[in-house]
Amino acid sequence: TEYEINLENIFSESLDFDHKIVQSACRDLQAYVDRDPACDHYVTPLLFYKGFQALQLHRICHSLWIRDQRYLARYLQSKMSEYYGVDIHPGAIIGGGVMLDHATSLVIGETAVVGDDVSILHSVTLGGSGLQSGDRHPKIANGVLIAAGAKVLGDIAVGEGVKIGAGSLVLESVPAYVTVAGVP
């Protein structure tokens, strides 16, 4: 039909447009091997880990987003959300060497930034804190660990090397190399 989507062409165009997609995917793959004790081989995330797969699809969606193909980016993101249970807005910027462990119920908002070498576990939200528009989501620096169920909300900065405990609610910026846990 005339509305058929040729994913192979979309992916090829995105990879041609942004060569960092493949570099980031390789770094992501290495992150799983290095940080996930259940990952016994490089092929495991490629075939079986929805966090890895969703992240790679996000990279394609983000490429479409910045090339102003926003309806297509949102469509693919919506399908990703339905299939994987992972909701990453196409506008979100995500570095390389990122591990989304399990990834079920993960939400990353439009203006969120995730640095390099970050580990995010399931049921994490990097979201806004209200109805404001514009820059409204967290900025996560390199080397951060965000444990299961944590909620990091608002236009705040989480410094390099921070560890956020499971189930924590973070509403204020966090300096580098500290551990935060709990609910304010």
Question: What is the meaning of each model-derived region?
Answer:
Residues 1-79:
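Terminal amphipathic alpha-helical/low-complexity segments used for targeting or macromolecular assembly
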Residues 81-184:
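Structural signal for interior beta-strand "rungs" in well-ordered beta-sheet cores
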